[in-house]
Amino acid sequence: SGNLKIVGTATDSYFDSYLLQQVNGANPEEGDWQPIEGVSATPVNSSTLRQFATTTVADGIYSLRLRVTDKVGQITTVRRTITIDNTPPKVTLQSPTQNQVVSQTVGIMGVVSDANLEQVQVFFRRSGNWRSVTTVRGSTVSDRLAEWDTARLADGEYQLKLVATDGSGQPPTELTRTVIVDNTLPQAEIASPRNDDQVGQVVVLS
């Protein structure tokens, strides 16, 4: 994603020039190739050939072609295939909802999608550092993302965080939500009458 630095070598004892080209697709036709910054007459040895501004093209599979020409017109060609992905992962957290009261084992429900999704991480914290719930890997993660065991946690307000990372090196997508943990049972008491008390209407004789 972003500006891709293309590193390589374009030299010869009788070097003339090199041309770096790109095209959408893995098997392009000859006339489809587009130059990246034009022809260069300066030899390069294990250094930057060109910068490819990938944000100027659509996401997808692209072919790169380096053509090095010498003084007598001989040409050496090298090709590479890459995947451009400038679209961050899309994250939807369906449950628990914001400020929902939860207890015991909580199902974290949602959908994370991306063409090149690498992993989804789920974290929680009450304060301080984030603690991991789980890490899920796959191209698309949906429905039950994780199960969060709150049984041993103190009651109170917590934050949940989903972090989705793709394989293109761009910043991850994060989503944070506040929930309230309540594992304390309600109090219930009948103060009067006492258990097994005999009760009835009071009759006054006169």
Placement of each model-derived feature along the sequence:
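Short, solvent-exposed loop/linker segments at the N-terminal edge
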Residues: 1-3, 98-104, 195-202
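Aromatic/hydrophobic beta-strand junction motif of beta-rich domains
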Residues: 6-10, 108-112, 205-206
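Solvent-exposed loop/turn segments flanking beta-strands in beta-repeat/beta-sandwich domains
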Residues: 11-24, 113-124
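Flexible, low-complexity linkers/stalks enriched in Thr/Pro that connect modular domains
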Residues: 53, 70, 80-92, 149, ...
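Surface-exposed, short loops/turns at beta-strand junctions within beta-sandwich domains
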Residues: 55-60, 151-156
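Short, solvent-exposed loop/turn segments at the edges of extracellular beta-sandwich modules
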Residues: 69-74, 165-170
